[in-house]
Amino acid sequence: MLSSLANPRQAASQLLNFALILSTAFMMWKGLSVVSDSPSPIVVVLSGSMEPAFQRGDLLFLWNRNIIQETEVGEIVVYEVRGKNIPIVHRVVRKFGAGSEAKLLTKGDNNQGSDEELYAKDQDFLVRKDIIGSVVAYIPFVGYVTILLSEYPWLKTAMLGIMGLVVVLQRE
């Protein structure tokens, strides 16, 4: 097994294969970002605030249609609160105005009240630039891996270690 480490060419080849896999994944992510016009075209539902529409761990695919069509009441959007890097998935419940100046109020389907307390300080509504994208599709429970990795940091280290060992010890 460890004989592959003795051959520097084979070790370099395996390292390059691993780098190729990582760069391909990155390019696919960036390509999807460009096509969807969203900085985060795929997000994971982190809480139960949108149940029963979406469960914790669902993987959501986003599309940012602000050029073609306006965000409407009833649409499920993902937004980021200014100054925080946490995507929030909620439904637009009220809209004031039209176009890029429209003000939007959101609420989780499973929440009692609207999201005003979640917005940034001195912000009563969302504007279109706060929206990361609208939900167009989802895959149930696939995102649980992300939740597990964030809740149990040791699991992330173990998975990276196992993947590294597989790459190093792989025989071709």
UniProtKB/Swiss-Prot annotation:
Enzymatic reactions: Cleavage of hydrophobic, N-terminal signal or leader sequences from secreted and periplasmic proteins
One cellular-component annotation, GO: signal peptidase complex
EC number, UniProt record: 3.4.21.89
Cytoplasmic side: 1-14
Lumenal compartment spans: 36-172
Keywords for this protein: Endoplasmic reticulum, Hydrolase, Membrane, Protease, Signal-anchor, Transmembrane, Transmembrane helix
PANTHER family in alphabetical order: SIGNAL PEPTIDASE COMPLEX CATALYTIC SUBUNIT SEC11
Disulfide bonds: none
Full protein name: Signal peptidase complex catalytic subunit SEC11
Ranges that cross the membrane: 15-35
Region described as C-terminal short (CTS) helix: 158-169
Coiled-coil intervals, chain numbering: none
Protein origin, superkingdom: Eukaryota
Membrane topology: Single-pass type II membrane protein
Record family assignment: Belongs to the peptidase S26B family.
InterPro entries per record: LexA/Signal_pep-like_sf, Pept_S26A_signal_pept_1_Ser-AS, Peptidase_S26B
Record text on subunit structure and interactions: Component of the signal peptidase complex (SPC) composed of a catalytic subunit SEC11 and three accessory subunits SPC1, SPC2 and SPC3. The complex induces a local thinning of the ER membrane which is used to measure the length of the signal peptide (SP) h-region of protein substrates. This ensures the selectivity of the complex towards h-regions shorter than 18-20 amino acids. SPC associates with the translocon complex.
Entry note about domains: The C-terminal short (CTS) helix is essential for catalytic activity. It may be accommodated as a transmembrane helix in the thinned membrane environment of the complex, similarly to the signal peptide in the complex substrates.
Active site, per annotation: S49 (charge relay system), H90 (charge relay system), D115 (charge relay system)
Subcellular location: Endoplasmic reticulum membrane
BP term (GO), one: signal peptide processing
GO molecular function: serine-type endopeptidase activity
